[in-house]
Amino acid sequence: MSYTLGQLAAKVQGVVKGDADLVIDKLGSLENATSKELSFLANSKYQSLLGTTSAGAVLVKTDELAQLVDNAIVVSNPYLAFAQISHLFVPTTHSWSGIHQSAVVSPKATIAENVVVGPNAVIDDDVLIAEDCVIGAGSVLSRGVKIGKGSRIYSNVTLYHDVEVGEACIIHSGTVIGADGFGFAPNDGFWEKIDQLGSVIIGNNVEIGANSTIDRGAIENTQIGNGVKIDNQVQIAHNVVIGDNTAIAGCVGIAGSVKIGASCTISGGAGIAGHLSIVDHTHITGMTMITKSIDEAGSYSSGMGMEPTGKWRRTAARIRRIDEMAKQISSLGQQIKKLSDKG
């Protein structure tokens, strides 16, 4: 896959500074790109690398920055332009076409044109796969699953019965969608299983990382909105609703019946307790524990950041004494007030 600099500039509505006929074969970082590769500068703290990079061309924001390299594409948002151009250089991820002979496909399944089904995949009864989809090797689409146009299911993904995936979605390997939610009723010292009768409904243009899990609803469906991006090893429990264009980083755990608004970001390792609501445009920093609903947009954090071990131990020791210290401060305040009253 090769493109001229002029072709790439047209793709992102950019302006070429330099040789528009320069052929670009790959994308690369400013540190390691070669003369046939395109890089980008999105953060000014890396501007010094423009003087040392071997990249054939660089995506930059201003004409002034373009003057620091031999060839450039000037765009308003270099990082976004880099993302858009990256789609042109995606390699083919499978070496077969059509339905592989080792795949197990039910005669009751409906598979549209231009669908690829990999080796040892299983397509159960009443599955509906729209056109231009790719189902990777070893993936299992259980009874009644629906996959929208242009979606890609990588190898060894499991979709339980009646799960629905929208158009242009990407689901990475090892992900399990539609397993039973964690529902049990206490019964005289034992646990009675609550069968999970809902499903999981995933919107359009959703990406789900490797080894993530999304549980089916107990009665109502678990719902993932359009444009949602979910990183690796994320757990989403039953009946959760996630609004459009929310992004969730790795190792986040979301307990049952949580409702998360649109355009939120949840950073890595955060935990959200069950039955809470979070409004649109809320941003949760890494390792934060959410224990109550958030009804005002903004950035929220909890916990303590890293310190040298000795300092952290002293801080922890003081935290253990916080009740005692509060009483001492209150007592001192009362003594000061008495002295002031005597005046």
UniProtKB/Swiss-Prot annotation:
NCBIfam families: lipid_A_lpxD, PRK00892.1. PROSITE patterns: HEXAPEP_TRANSFERASES (PS00101). Homotrimer. It comes from Marinomonas sp. (strain MWYL1). One of its GO terms (molecular function) is N-acyltransferase activity. This is UDP-3-O-acylglucosamine N-acyltransferase. Signal peptide: none annotated. Belongs to the transferase hexapeptide repeat family. LpxD subfamily. The active site is at H238 (proton acceptor). Its EC number is 2.3.1.191. It catalyses: a UDP-3-O-[(3R)-3-hydroxyacyl]-alpha-D-glucosamine + a (3R)-hydroxyacyl-[ACP] = a UDP-2-N,3-O-bis[(3R)-3-hydroxyacyl]-alpha-D-glucosamine + holo-[ACP] + H(+). CDD domains: LbH_LpxD. One of its GO terms (biological process) is lipid A biosynthetic process.
